[in-house]
Amino acid sequence: MSGASVKVAVRVRPFNSRETSKESKCIIQMQGNSTSIINPKNPKEAPKSFSFDYSYWSHTSPEDPCFASQNRVYNDIGKEMLLHAFEGYNVCIFAYGQTGAGKSYTMMGKQEESQAGIIPQLCEELFEKINDNCNEEMSYSVEVSYMEIYCERVRDLLNPKNKGNLRVREHPLLGPYVEDLSKLAVTSYTDIADLMDAGNKARTVAATNMNETSSRSHAVFTIVFTQKKQDPETNLSTEKVSKISLVDLAGSERADSTGAKGTRLKEGANINKSLTTLGKVISALAEVDNCTSKSKKKKKTDFIPYRDSVLTWLLRENLGGNSRTAMVAALSPADINYDETLSTLRYADRAKQIKCNAVINEDPNAKLVRELKEEVTRLKDLLRAQGLGDIIDIDPLIDDYSGSGGKYLKDFQNNKHRYLLASENQRPGNFSTASMGSLTSSPSSCSLNSQVGLTSVTSIQERIMSTPGGEEAIERLKESEKIIAELNETWEEKLRKTEAIRMEREALLAEMGVAIREDGGTLGVFSPKKTPHLVNLNEDPLMSECLLYYIKDGITRVGQADAERRQDIVLSGAHIKEEHCLFRSERSNTGEVIVTLEPCERSETYVNGKRVAHPVQLRSGNRIIMGKNHVFRFNHPEQARAEREKTPSAETPSEPVDWTFAQRELLEKQGIDMKQEMEKRLQEMEILYKKEKEEADLLLEQQRLDYESKLQALQRQVETRSLAAETTEEEEEEEEVPWTQHEFELAQWAFRKWKSHQFTSLRDLLWGNAVYLKEANAISVELKKKVQFQFVLLTDTLYSPVPPELLPSEMEKTHEDRPFPRTVVAVEVQDLKNGATHYWSLDKLKQRLDLMREMYDRAGEVASSAQDDSETTMTGSDPFYDRFHWFKLVGSSPIFHGCVNERLADRTPSPTFSTADSDITELADEQQDAMEDFDDEAFVDDTGSDAGTEEGSELFSDGHDPFYDRSPWFILVGRAFVYLSNLLYPVPLIHRVAIVSEKGEVRGFLRVAVQAIAADEEAPDYGSGIRQSGTAKISFDNEYFNQSDFSSAAMTRSGLSLEELRIVEGQGQSSEVISPPEEVNRMNDLDLKSGTLLDGKMVMEGFSEEIGNHLKLGSAFTFRVTVLQASGILPEYADIFCQFNFLHRHDEAFSTEPLKNNGRGSPLGFYHVQNIAVEVTESFVDYIKTKPIVFEVFGHYQQHPLHLQGQDLNSPPQPSRRFFPPPMPLSKPVPATKLNTMNKTTLGQSMSKYDLLVWFEISELEPTGEYIPAVVDHTAGLPCQGTFLLHQGIQRRITVTIIHEKGSELHWKDVRELVVGRIRNKPEVDEAAVDAVLSLNIISAKSLKAAHSSSRTFYRFEAVWDSSLHNSLLLNRVTPYGEKIYMTLSAYLELDHCIQPAVITKDVCMVFYSRDAKISPPRSLRNLFGSGYSKSPDSNRVTGIYELSLCKMADTGSPGMQRRRRKVLDTSVAYVRGEENLAGWRPRGDSLILEHQWELEKLELLHEVEKTRHFLLLRERLGDSVPKSLSDSLSPSLSSGTLSTSTSISSQISTTTFESAITPSESSGYDSADVESLVDREKELATKCLQLLTHTFNREFSQVHGSISDCKLSDISPIGRDPSVSSFSSSTLTPSSTCPSLVDSRSSSMDQKTPEANSRASSPCQEFEQFQIVPTVETPYLARAGKNEFLNLVPDIEEVRAGSVVSKKGYLHFKEPLSSNWAKHFVVVRRPYVFIYNSDKDPVERGIINLSTAQVEYSEDQQAMVKTPNTFAVCTKHRGVLLQALNDKDMNDWLYAFNPLLAGTIRSKLSRRCPSQPKY
């Protein structure tokens, strides 16, 4: 035994054409036996070096001295291995490497002698040595086999009969071998070369990106070399058998490198599997050999995975076994193949560590035969032991073992199947005994022959099948005897077998029509010299004459492969018959071969362009066309040679006889002239074109005449009306209408109300001035001014006072007449240079814009020496800059509905006082002087000669740059307000008030103490701060006080008059809840009676008796205001100080000292004490009773966000989270493509409204052929939202289902169009982006059939959506992680009696995954451990809520009304010079108005919080001794403050009810039952509330037909597979606007059982429920209207976004229709909608109820009658629902969520009925 390592050599080839075209660089270096590789991605990295036995440099040309040729490689490796083979060792050489690296070249080489590879050189030298060493004592025999491993299957390359895949088996003695693999005996190198060439042509090759002829299989060429030596002395012969395995591996590759797809990719996967397994085997063998452990035990890790692939299984002996092995690793030098080359080097480095234990194979046949005979004997003994001895008793004297086992087992296999059938039928089959003849005739089966009469084959097989292990033993016996027969085969028999196989191969090839040389040499297609034949002609010249078909002697048939008789030439095609034609080849008397073409019946066969129906004799060169596509040329070599001899001067035809020639000949012979046909067709098209053009011109002329006549008629009509109008105006004089006082009040109320609406006027200002804003920004960018402009809305409130320069002059004149401040449009100027923000009026912007234009025009004249270093100096009056407030306002406190005095317009502190003896006055004066000095020094105006100015700024003679204004040092941080009502009693209070900025942001807190003191009381010593030694005197003059702006009635009015609310259009109360003028007048009268302010006058009746003695009119009163601490102010504001003043005396401010603010540690301690003395007047008492004092906090702003982040121009200010709009904004409808342009119709009166619940589904095509809804991600948790999870590149459909209550006015007629567009990756829609709109094909649109009594309508339509037509990358690719795709779809639906379609628009969110991805819906944390409802298929949809209004078309009105309705042009789209430099910036539009309204609402809520906090603090301090004056003075103020401009009346009532429910005895001062003590106004209010609470609804329908709820919340499926229409619908109680009483419901439907006993979960059903019909009592609009009015309805659909605030959620029981059962469903109240789900895990809304149009009823009498507790009803216009809660408390909670007013009424009744019980 000899142990040696595997010899490893590496060889690098030259660049191929692909690498040369890509200009690749060489990364391989070789020096001696060392090989290095350089990383092209990181050249600085040290090269990786490897050491091998041989390193061959074949990258250069042969002229290079270092070049390694084929001969050198063979001399180093091949000769050594051949020497080992002669010594008797097994030898293996295999090449490894990536595809195209040169493995096949190294192993096989090329045809040239100098290019031969290792295999041919080794074979050639093998026979040379045999010939040299052959003598009488030595004899040699060589056998070869050639197999291919393709896709893990083994194929024989030498035997054409072995077309199938061969089995790989393993024998205990032989090891792994290939069953039935041909082993052919050869006697010379020529035989091997022929076999090798034949096998190579049969190999599987294909082209990849890396190699044009890539080997797609592993080839193993095996040579069995036997040496026999006869010893003359002993007359004994010995044998040496060597097995030479030469392996050409397929290329290792990567799919992305080779570009493999389809079959190539599958092949590559199997190739990589084999090579990966080979690498694992190499690594495992290397680890085993390197193990130095002394332990001899086999470890678990020593397992070698030979069986993981066929390749390693067959090469097991060559890898680490009995073999001498050499490995050649082929390398690519190109840098583009770095990864593959490095992998090959690493494998080779591992392979050189493998140890092989090779032994000399001496006389293996004799040993093997002996062992096999022992194995046969053992198997026979085993069969005898099992009782089968009579089967295998064979006389050994008759013959040897050849064939007996095989014959018997063949019979056994043939009869096995019939035996099993016979066994199943329990009857023995009469098997044919013909096979027994073969058994008896077998030389080794005489014993079995003697028992034929006793035993049949059937009985033998039955015994074998019934014996355990018998079949396996027979199979192994067959295997062993086959090997014995093969080993005993003589050399002569092997040669005969080889010759037979060669003959069969040649016959098979000749049968296929492929010619072979007469000497039987190399295969190829040759032009025959004698035999007639056909060659193909193809349209592609490169494909012509590539096929050759022999015309054999006799008959050669042509037809299809599936013909009854075998066809010699097989063709395929549409016009090829099964038996198409035949060629008859016969020899004439003269010896000439004549070929005749005989077409079959109805076959299309053409010869030289003529169709033949009878036999035709063919001449050489004839063109034959079979069918339509198969073109051939007939060649007769002998006939052509004879013709050339007869006419040697025959000219060569000028045109080649090819496919084109044959086709043209066919057309000519058929009478078809292509040129004439084309001319004729062209003439026909010209005639058609002229005809259509004449028709179009005629139609256009007719249309022009029609338009002209219509224009003339309209002109005459306008002239006639204008003349009549002028005549009427001249003749008629307007008479004064005699109005009554009541009518005048109504008109005044309406005028003041509608004058308050500013939405349209603000929008017009924004649109009309947008062009100026854009131009200013463009000039700023051009001149490199660091200024940005944007629109902003300002409202004059206490928190955000508007400077007087921003108020228009006409507004100042009418300022006192308004009950509340107006909103103005201003320009926000962001000074990025100084970090300041200024506000300009529109007039100021236009003035500055003129200067900017002038500066821009003269900018080119500026000297080049002017430097832009104005950063070092402060700017002057640049039009782009305003003065910067270094002390910035942080915040302020409550807001009032009344106007704010103009004194708050001054933003800089001006501490002046009315008394001259105050020390603080002197200190304040000093501070003011210092500030003025600082201001003069720091903010010096820039002059025109200053070099530090911006470009062009020195052009103005006054030295003012129009881009800049002066900036102050201080910025207002915020404001806070403190009420003084505690001075009425008097009690000291310490307030902690919020410092609120102008944007409603809380910037900190301020602690202020207010108390009444004696005139000579000393202030406490706080240790720091300023303690005033004097007392400031403030006067409250009644006359001056009443004339002030701030004393508007809106500040103290406690009524519910809507005219006193600040209204920005669209934010006020809805039309359904607006109080009529009579109510308003009645409330105004109540205001007069209650003693509140009205038109600036105070009614003080009875007040003097309630105030204390310390506030007697005319007396002196002193109180103290102490500013204690400030906390929570950001550290960006330094040098914090505070000043405060009274509202009517803004010029008298009291200031503290500035304090350093570091933002950490203890609060800032001002401890500023100010004593204030006043003379008590009615104005003073009213002031401390209802009004606060204002505190303003200033600071030096150190950090400027504008410097740090350069805010985006188009980023709007973000409102608070509470009022922020929904995450996905509502989009405008996508324009229709098939419909005419829809004009925006002015809507008139709304005739009816419907709530639409719409389901959106996207279905994808499944492998089953069905469209299944795609998975929807509902993890966001918000209603009406979800993300579709789609697969890439799959056909889809969009399904839309509309659900609504039945109505006579609403009938869906058809779907006009469904369009999709606006593909984007963000929720916001870029209006400027141009996106292709795709109109989808509607495949179905129908109303889903429901029961005739159902109160809900289901309308569904479906469209085909091919997302590839958008040509959008977002839809075609897989969506990156974290990104979402948004798309807008709009459905245009036609309704009956409507003049234009209704439009439903929805923004859809999507995420695309790969085609094969397994998509499952994400599960929220709540459902992590439970079964999520989203697994249900009907959960894969997204819902939308819409409100449909059917309105009458508004009358156009008079010309004056039309002028007032004119639409202001949006100038934001107008082009200005330099606009392209703004990088997509756009002026703010309508959204700015909504955001500003949200800010005002937040400020108002902050105001209410501070006011309520003061009231509660004072009441807590007073305890139980709350005087009546407190409730009289503060309660109305608080109640008035609860009115909000955006809250509904229901929310107001609920707030009032809540406040009244909190200890009414403490808050009002009287007991709830003591009605006699109420004042007149409170009596009036109580009476009104009582009327509302006890209002009796329409009860004319005493009998309710049907139950309360007519639908289960189950899935209703009109389609068998998809329960898609799961809904919530209810039976119609009455269509009237009022809900009938539920007390008179049928007792049969109201079972006495509780819902808990009868409740059941909803389940999907296949049919709609049967509902009861209720007569309609209200005549619908269409029934009342005339026929002409039917066409005047205009549909208006608006999407409604549900609120994010959940009032209540939980389970409720719903009464089921026509039964006594109750269904349990999950309900979520998000006002104003109630969402109904199947369960708490159901993500899809199944039903909705609009609480704003519904009526909630609760009756104890009803519950007593039906004996069902805790029930209440919800009635809409068309239906009613009966609900039941779990218990009393749960029912009260639900009632409060549904209707707070009703819940408050119930609580009041319970509290009066059971006063001792706690209130709900």
From Swiss-Prot:
Q: InterPro entries per the record?
A: FHA_dom, Kinesin-like, Kinesin-like_KIF1-typ, Kinesin_assoc, Kinesin_motor_CS, Kinesin_motor_dom, Kinesin_motor_dom_sf, P-loop_NTPase
Could you tell me which residues carry Phosphothreonine?
A: T647, T652
Composition bias, Low complexity: 1525-1553, 1620-1637
Tell me which GO cellular component terms the UniProt record holds. axon cytoplasm; cytoplasmic vesicle; microtubule; mitochondrion; neuron projection; postsynapse; presynapse; synaptic vesicle membrane
Domain (Kinesin motor) ranges = 5-354
The domain of life for this entry's organism is Eukaryota
Q: Where is this region: Interaction with KIFBP?
A: 270-350
Residue list for modification N-acetylserine: S2
Under the heading PROSITE patterns, the entry gives: FHA_DOMAIN, KINESIN_MOTOR_1, KINESIN_MOTOR_2, PH_DOMAIN
* Residues that bear Phosphoserine: S1054, S1057, S1416, S1454, S1487, S1573, S1603, S1610, S1613
Keywords, ordered alphabetically: Acetylation, ATP-binding, Coiled coil, Cytoplasm, Cytoplasmic vesicle, Cytoskeleton, Isomerase, Membrane, Microtubule, Mitochondrion, Motor protein, Nucleotide-binding, Phosphoprotein, Synapse
Annotated coiled-coil positions are 365-386, 470-502, 668-737, 841-869
Q: What is its EC number?
A: 5.6.1.3
Which stretches make up the PH domain? 1702-1799
Q: What happens when the gene is disrupted?
A: Knockout pups were delivered in normal Mendelian ratios but displayed multiple neurological abnormalities and died within minutes after birth. They display an overall reduction of motosensory neural function. The cellularity, organization, and development of the brain stem nuclei and commissural fibers are significantly affected.
Q: Which PANTHER family match?
A: KINESIN-LIKE PROTEIN KIF1B ISOFORM X1, STAR-RELATED LIPID TRANSFER PROTEIN 9
What does the record give as the function of this protein? Has a plus-end-directed microtubule motor activity and functions as a motor for transport of vesicles and organelles along microtubules.
In its UniProt entry, what is this protein called? Kinesin-like protein KIF1B
What is the organism of origin for this protein? Answer: Mus musculus
